[in-house]
């Protein structure tokens, strides 16, 4: 970064920004104090010893005002500057710089955390779940970060505070809040692809941005409006475009000295040509040989293997209100409510793995079939908690008591063309996708009736952090309940699950700068009713997936605060894990009895301040994750590299100009029966900033590596993004 942020009384140096990019945890419920200016509003020269930010309060893992150093969990944060400097547009792209997390296949329904496949509804906005898309590929995607002040990645489960469904880890986006200082920014972002297989600067994704904040009357009423409009954004694959409008509008009312009310409205309107995700895959270089074991390089990376009439739409509206009230000096209340409505639909012609399509590895002519899906989802989410502190002699208690509720009403429809009917009607050439036939859409395909599903989640939780001298013991207790009801083929399946969960941790202060910690937390996730109906083959007595998470770590400041580091050893296990298996009658949902999965490893997040002009940040994860029973016993879990590392380097040339270099590596991964090769990629950036202007030029995948990002359908693969030249220009006034 070229300059410092001024926060509150201008006490924050470049070291604060550096450290926060690695180990700062963002609040899942927090509304900044009205006087807290989280945006850059002033620039000063960088000089002197970096100041540590490790004592800053953080609530993502605890929902309590606990410092980073005192939080006994492994987590990483990317703030707005980190996202901008790396040209990261959404959570999926942010995974590139967060070891231990990575995206799955093209439909974006799950992501990997600590080797465990995790539903995307574990992505939260301001502490509440935010699916922001329909079921089953109907336009759902990992959320944009256009309005993110911070994005936090919590490794491991946290069922005590967030309830059922938190698997390998959760993600929380803290949205930008209204500020007391009036400021408006308008900008333009453009991403162009420059590669031999996509053409040079022929495919461009341009968006226009607005960020305006300040007081409306006096400082007791503030506003913030953020918007991003992409009129016709090109994907790197020819034939795929997106038109997208993102809007986030918020107010802040300060009612006296003790109460703040923050209503917020968010809107997403997304239209895609070229499909919703089913047909993202391309073929790779070993396909023509007739045998695929380890994927080769993607071929025709810049081509789309779906049809010219594939479309996808997604509209999502969210209204929320956050209330914070200071009850007494040491007691406060926080209440957060959100209502979300989403409609979505998608039509795709895709290459299925169905054997009835009669496709063969090595055979150039490949059959495809139509799929249509639609969703109409409604969510109500609510969280309220009381936090306070009491002392009994030499023992200090930091207490939290809360209630979390989610009500889901989902109507989901999905219909596939019969595979036998599709044979010969929609062929495409594996070697040249321009040679294809788009057959008619089967009658009634888009008229498939929706299958309604309702689900309610209740979570009552209690936390107590008991401090005696330099030792803090953190204990938690929660009652978790989930009720599901689903209608399919005239049959209603209702199920109810509940459990009492507990967790325990200890944080030991070694000295002023260093703490060690040990933590135990729980995971609890009932099986979705939709999966039971569609893939259970008559089996209905599925047990909830349960798990344990153990962490042992150290975090603190070293070398006169020039090095901030967090090192965590972890062990995670699961009982009653589920997995999809291709049987003679199609896909079936299997459940492995007892302890069935484990993941062990180490995570390192560090930031080094070498000089006032040069600093680096590192994220590394070693993950050994596999089934402990069954045919895949001991086999590394899908899409999970044993080694993942990212390194980001900043060099400040002068007060206006800076440069950056990012390096990323992942070791070999599995994709079912196939292997995905290891890779190394590099990103570079150049930045210019004044009081009124900032310009950034970032080239992702600067060496234009052509590799497999993930598996898709059958033996097709999702290619990585080619060399992307990102230019952003912003004017501030």
Indicate residue ranges for each PLM-predicted region:
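Acidic/polar loop-and-plug regions of large Gram-negative outer-membrane beta-barrel proteins
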Residues: 230-234, 242-243, 247-254, 258-326, ...
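Outer-membrane beta-barrel translocator/receptor signature
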Residues: 132, 138, 146-149, 160-247, ...
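Structural signature of Gram-negative outer-membrane beta-barrels, strongest in the C-terminal barrel
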Residues: 252-256, 377, 394-408, 449-574, ...
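Gram-negative outer-membrane beta-barrel transporters
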Residues: 470, 566, 571-573, 592-672, ...
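Conserved C-terminal beta-signal and adjacent last beta-strands/turns
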Residues: 29, 375, 387, 398-399, ...
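Membrane-embedded beta-barrel scaffold of Gram-negative outer-membrane proteins
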Residues: 324-338, 342-348, 544-627, 695
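Surface-exposed extracellular loop regions of Gram-negative outer-membrane beta-barrel proteins
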Residues: 271-285, 407-411, 483, 507-551, ...
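Acidic, small-polar-rich N-terminal luminal/periplasmic segments of exported/outer-membrane proteins
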Residues: 21, 38-181, 195-200, 552
């Amino acid at each position: 970064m070229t300059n410092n942020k001024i926060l509150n009384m201008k006490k924050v140096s470049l070291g604060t920004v550096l450290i926060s990019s690695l180990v700062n945890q963002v609040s899942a419920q927090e509304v900044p104090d009205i006087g807290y200016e989280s945006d850059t509003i002033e620039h000063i020269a960088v000089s002197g010893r970096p100041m540590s930010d490790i004592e800053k309060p953080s609530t993502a893992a605890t929902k309590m005002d606990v410092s980073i150093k005192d939080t006994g969990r492994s987590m990483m944060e990317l703030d707005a500057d980190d996202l901008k400097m790396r040209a990261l547009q959404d959570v999926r792209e942010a995974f590139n710089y967060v070891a231990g997390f990575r995206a799955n296949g093209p439909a974006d329904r799950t992501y990997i955390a600590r080797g465990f496949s995790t539903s995307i509804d574990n992505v939260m906005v301001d502490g509440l779940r935010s699916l922001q898309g329909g079921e089953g590929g109907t336009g759902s995607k990992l959320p944009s970060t256009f309005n993110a002040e911070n994005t936090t990645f919590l490794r491991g489960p946290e069922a005590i505070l967030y309830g059922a469904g938190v698997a390998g880890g959760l993600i929380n986006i803290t949205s930008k809040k209204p500020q007391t200082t009036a400021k408006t920014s308008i900008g333009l972002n453009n991403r162009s692809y420059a590669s031999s297989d996509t053409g040079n600067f022929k495919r461009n994704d341009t968006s226009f941005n607005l960020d305006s904040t300040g007081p409306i009357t006096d400082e007791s009423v503030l506003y913030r409006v953020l918007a991003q409009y992409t009129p016709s954004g090109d994907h790197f694959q020819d034939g795929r475009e997106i038109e997208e409008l993102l809007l986030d509008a918020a107010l802040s009312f300060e009612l006296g000295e003790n109460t703040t009310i923050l209503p917020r409205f968010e809107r997403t309107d997304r239209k895609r040509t070229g499909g919703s995700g089913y047909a993202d895959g391309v073929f790779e270089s070993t396909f023509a040989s007739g045998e695929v074991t380890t994927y080769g390089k993607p071929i025709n990376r810049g081509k789309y293997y779906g049809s010219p009439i594939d479309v996808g739409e997604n509209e999502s509206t969210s209204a929320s209100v956050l209330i914070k009230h200071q009850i007494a000096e040491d007691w406060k209340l926080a209440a957060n409510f959100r209502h979300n409505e989403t409609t979505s639909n998608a039509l795709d012609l895709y290459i299925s793995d169905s054997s009835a399509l009669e496709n063969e590895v090595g055979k150039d002519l490949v059959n495809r079939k139509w799929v249509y899906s639609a969703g109409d989802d409604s969510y109500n989410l609510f969280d309220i908690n009381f936090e306070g502190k009491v002392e009994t002699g030499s023992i200090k208690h930091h207490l939290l008591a809360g209630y979390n509720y989610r009500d889901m009403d989902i109507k989901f429809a999905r219909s596939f063309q019969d595979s036998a009917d599709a044979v010969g009607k929609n062929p495409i050439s594996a070697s040249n996708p321009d040679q294809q036939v788009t057959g008619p859409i089967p009658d009634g395909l888009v008229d498939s009736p929706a299958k309604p599903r309702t689900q309610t989640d209740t979570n009552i939780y209690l936390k107590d952090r008991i401090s005696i001298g330099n030792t803090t013991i953190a204990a938690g207790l929660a009652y978790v309940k989930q009720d599901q009801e689903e209608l399919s083929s005239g049959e209603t399946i209702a199920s109810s699950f509940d459990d009492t969960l507990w967790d325990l941790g200890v944080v030991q202060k070694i000295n002023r700068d260093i703490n060690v910690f040990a933590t135990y937390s729980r995971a609890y996730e009932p099986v979705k009713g939709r999966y039971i109906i569609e893939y259970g083959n008559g089996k209905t007595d599925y047990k909830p997936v349960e798990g344990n998470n153990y962490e042992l770590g150290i975090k603190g400041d070293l070398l006169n605060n020039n090095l901030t580091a967090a090192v965590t050893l972890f062990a995670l296990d699961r009982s009653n894990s589920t997995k999809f298996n291709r049987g003679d009658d199609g896909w079936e949902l299997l459940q492995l009895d007892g302890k069935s999965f484990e993941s062990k490893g180490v995570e390192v997040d560090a930031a080094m301040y070498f000089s006032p002009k040069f600093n680096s940040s590192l994220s590394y994860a070693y993950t050994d994750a596999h089934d402990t029973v069954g045919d895949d016993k001991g086999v590394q879990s899908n899409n999970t590299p044993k080694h993942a590392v990212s390194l980001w380097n900043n060099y400040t040339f002068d007060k206006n100009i800076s440069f950056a270099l990012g390096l990323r590596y992942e070791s070999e991964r599995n994709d079912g029966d196939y292997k995905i090769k290891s890779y190394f990629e590099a990103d570079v950036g150049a930045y210019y900033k004044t009081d009124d202007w900032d310009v950034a030029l970032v080239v992702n995948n600067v060496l234009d590596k052509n590799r497999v990002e993930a598996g898709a359908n059958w033996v097709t693969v999702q290619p990585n993004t080619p060399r992307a030249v990102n230019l952003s220009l912003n004017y501030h006034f």
